[in-house]
Swiss-Prot record:
This is Growth/differentiation factor 7. May play an active role in the motor area of the primate neocortex. It comes from Chlorocebus aethiops (Green monkey). Highly expressed in the primary aera of brain neocortex. Coiled coil: none annotated. The lineage of its organism: Eukaryota, Metazoa, Chordata, Craniata, Vertebrata. It is found in: Secreted.
């Protein structure tokens, strides 16, 4: 076994076998009566809505995911012990995955049409009163973006509330909003956007297209981890500075805003390679290993974090999965134990995937389950045309029918697959929407 294969095996074992308090979240939620979320593909499963899933924080975070706690920033929200997804990312998932209810407000689609990955970066900057007078800076850690991916769109979303009093200059012309890059030691700020701040009643998200600025940032020889933007307001003919809070920006009453009210940088990208869930699993395993190393060893006992409880949880999941496979294998006339004559012909069979049973519900937000299907049955002669056999499969099946010892029968395998969309929390605690190819079997064939 070469070193790369050995490393991959070790990472897989770490993901599957390390004691993980987060993996016990499924058992805790089952005890609390929480059900699975229906998949965007309409597969079987429970009837919870995504809004209910995002708000199902009845279980204390510390009891559900103590091992993941070091990865969470102070003051961040939790979803079953994880980061609370921004409302926009939830709306984006519903819209792009085809789950938006009738009459729902459409989300902006800057570059989303050509993207297969959309990442939401939450503002990490801290504001003070003096900074609010001159402008508001936004700081985003974009180091998790893959260098090989193409950025097809990026937008800054900032919450603005209506002001009860008209702003300065309202009788003549509205103030101007100026968005620029932050000044640095070796670079001058670059003006990105200039537009009028129209009077506002209620509240809304001001959206700024920053795709070109993001591309320039990534083209730098050694791009910094942080992507910094500065929003200012000016008024009058001489463009006098204006405090943003007078236009409804900023954090009411001082202090930090709620997670869902912080500014959001939404980056749409297109990967240059076929994405694999295994790659994200390895990243999750590395982050989890770092979190576990920072935790004190658990006390022996019967608690949810004890080795005995973790082992029991894994045993329950293995039993449940084995039971599911047995039930599926015995249905539909498969008849594995009655020889080849008793088996059904090659066809698509149900295969329900529950991410909670896999222990992935501590990082996958939606869907929590979906219908994947699988292919099962015999490929005997003559092969049916709907199985779309290859010429090689036809010859192999013919030889097998004449002399079974001369060649094995052709195999019943997926002939056509379709993607599903997954909303998840990556290893850097960003909420990511990604479309994964080849996740659902649409048709089976003999190969």
């Amino acid at each position: 076994m070469d070193l790369s294969a050995a490393a991959a095996l070790c990472l897989w074992l770490l993901s599957a076998c390390r004691p993980r308090d987060g993996l016990e979240a499924a058992a805790v939620l089952r005890a609390a009566g929480a059900g699975p979320v229906r998949s965007p593909g309409g597969g079987g499963g429970g009837g919870r809505t995504l809004a209910q899933a995002a708000g199902a924080a009845a279980v204390p975070a510390a009891a559900v995911s103590r091992a993941r706690a070091p990865r969470r920033a102070a003051g961040s929200g939790f979803r079953n012990g994880s980061v609370v997804p921004h409302h926009f990312m939830m709306s984006l998932y519903r819209s792009l995955a085809g789950r938006a209810p009738a009459g729902a407000v459409a989300v902006s689609s800057s570059g989303h049409g050509r993207a297969d990955t959309i990442t939401g970066f939450t503002d990490q900057a801290t504001q003070d009163e003096s900074a609010a007078e001159t402008g508001q800076s936004f700081l985003f850690d974009v180091s998790s973006l893959n260098d090989a991916d193409e950025v097809v769109g990026a937008e800054l979303r900032v919450l603005r509330r209506g002001s009860p009093e008209p702003g300065p200059g309202s009788s003549t012309s509205p103030p101007l909003l100026l968005l620029s890059t932050c000044p640095g030691a070796a670079r001058a700020p670059r003006l990105l956007y200039s537009r009028a701040a129209e009077p506002l009643v209620g509240q809304r998200w001001e959206v700024f297209d920053v795709a070109d600025a993001m591309r320039r940032h990534r083209r730098e020889p050694r791009p910094p981890r942080a992507f910094c933007l500065l929003l200012r307001a000016v008024t009058g003919p001489v463009r006098s500075p204006l405090a943003l809070r007078r236009l409804g920006f900023g954090w009411p009453g001082g202090g930090g805003s709620a997670p869902e009210e912080r500014a959001l940088l939404v980056v749409s990208s297109r990967t240059q390679r076929k994405e694999s869930l295994f790659r994200e699993m390895r990243a999750q395993a590395r982050a989890l290993g770092a979190a576990l190393a920072a935790q004190p060893p658990p006390d022996p006992g019967t608690g949810t974090g004890s080795p005995r409880a973790v082992t029991a949880g894994r045993r329950r999941r293995r039993t449940a999965l084995a039971g599911t496979r047995t039930a599926q294998g015995s249905g539909g006339g498969a008849g594995r134990g009655h020889g080849r004559r008793g088996r059904s012909r090659c066809s698509r069979k149900p295969l329900h995937v529950d991410f909670k049973e896999l222990g992935w519900d501590d990082w996958i937000i939606a869907p929590l389950d979906y219908e994947a299907y699988h292919c099962e049955g015999v490929c005997d002669f003559p092969l049916r045309s709907h199985l779309e056999p290859t010429n090689h499969a036809i010859i192999q099946t013919l030889l097998n029918s004449m002399a079974p010892d001369a060649a094995p029968a052709s195999c019943c395998v997926p002939a056509r697959l379709s993607p599903i969309s997954i909303l998840y929390i990556d290893a850097a605690n960003n909420v990511v929407y990604k479309q994964y190819e080849d996740m659902v079997v649409e048709a089976c064939g003999c190969r």
